[in-house]
């Protein structure tokens, strides 16, 4: 007889290994924890490794916050070879022997072009849709369509190491950034083409690689240890400011969903009732525009 699934609530930060899909990680973790409900917060390509937060239960309601959060990656780019997918899993479409002589100074001038506000064209091999069809499906059929560019922001772009035909970089960027596209664009700027050969996500929102678990680690844990690996919902917003409800505001918020304008509040705010986290609220110049209640931050609820 199938065991009753547990109503778990919180986030498990996974360190995804290479050659497994994000959805496979999700399904394995859901089975491992016998969880009723689970969802991930944006896919990592099978060849990519690193931070993949998985949400259980009520935490799935805030998955979008992690989708929208800034990310950090370590990426390795191979120069002189272009592929149709922009990474090592694609077919080679061009080769060049004209790789320039690389130096730290020269590469710095190239990387400087990609810091700050950047207009980027996503790769054809992506989950973005064109007339309802995922681009990767069209690409596999040999079809090419015009992909709309998007505005992204690269906050930090650091050269870690390089040799005659490759470079390793650290990238801190906004949502919607494709590191494969960045690799392609850097290769074009160098005049020799390039593609991504390794990618590790080292941070997603507040979650860092140092606090992530590999699936194999979790399989060896006791039930109590598995539960202890789940971080509470508030951890997603740990860098957000706190507003503590006044006694006279509680009925309006809880019973009527009303909240008086707060000119000093803007963006995402944690709402506290005494010392308890109860909600996440979105403010626009002091006006409440959205809210989500979390009546308890426990990891298991009946």
From Swiss-Prot:
Listed EC numbers: 5.4.99.25
GO molecular function, a single term: RNA binding
Reaction catalyzed: uridine(55) in tRNA = pseudouridine(55) in tRNA
Cystine pairs: none
Active site: 45 (nucleophile)
Matching InterPro entries: PsdUridine_synth_cat_dom_sf (IPR020103), PsdUridine_synth_N (IPR002501), tRNA_psdUridine_synth_TruB (IPR014780), TruB_C (IPR032819)
GO BP annotations, alphabetical order: mRNA pseudouridine synthesis; tRNA pseudouridine synthesis
Keyword Acyltransferase: no
Keyword tRNA processing: yes
Keywords: Isomerase, tRNA processing
Entry function: Responsible for synthesis of pseudouridine from uracil-55 in the psi GC loop of transfer RNAs.
Family: Belongs to the pseudouridine synthase TruB family. Type 1 subfamily.
Protein name: tRNA pseudouridine synthase B
Naturally occurring in which organism (per UniProt): Francisella tularensis subsp. tularensis (strain SCHU S4 / Schu 4)
């Amino acid at each position: 007889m199938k065991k009753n699934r547990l109503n778990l609530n919180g986030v498990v930060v996974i360190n995804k290994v290479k050659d497994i899909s994000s959805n496979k990680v999700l399904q394995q973790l859901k089975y491992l924890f016998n969880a009723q409900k689970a969802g991930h917060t944006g896919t990592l390509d099978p060849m990519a490794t690193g931070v993949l937060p998985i949400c259980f239960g009520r935490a799935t309601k805030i998955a979008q916050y992690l989708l929208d959060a800034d990310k950090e990656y370590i990426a390795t780019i191979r120069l002189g070879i272009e592929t149709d997918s922009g990474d090592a899993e694609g077919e080679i479409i061009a080769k060049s022997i004209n790789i320039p002589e690389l130096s730290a100074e020269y590469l710095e001038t190239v990387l400087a072009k990609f810091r700050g506000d950047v207009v980027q064209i996503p790769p054809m091999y992506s989950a973005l849709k064109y007339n309802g069809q995922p681009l990767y499906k069209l690409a596999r059929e040999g079809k090419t369509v015009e992909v709309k560019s998007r505005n992204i922001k690269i906050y930090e772009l650091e050269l870690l190491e390089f040799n005659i035909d490759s470079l390793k970089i650290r990238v801190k960027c906004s949502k919607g950034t494709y590191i494969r596209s960045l690799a392609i664009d850097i290769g074009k700027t160098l005049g020799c083409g390039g593609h991504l050969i390794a990618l590790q996500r080292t941070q997603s929102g507040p979650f860092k690689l140092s606090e992530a678990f590999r699936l194999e680690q979790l399989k060896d844990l006791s039930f109590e240890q598995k539960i202890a690996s789940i971080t509470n919902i508030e951890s997603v917003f740990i860098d957000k400011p706190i507003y503590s409800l006044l006694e006279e505001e509680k009925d309006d918020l809880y019973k009527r969903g009303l909240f008086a304008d707060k000119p000093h509040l803007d963006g995402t705010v944690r709402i506290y009732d005494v010392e308890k986290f109860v909600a996440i609220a979105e403010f626009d110049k002091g006006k409440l525009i959205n809210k989500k209640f979390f009546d308890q931050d426990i990891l298991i609820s009946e």
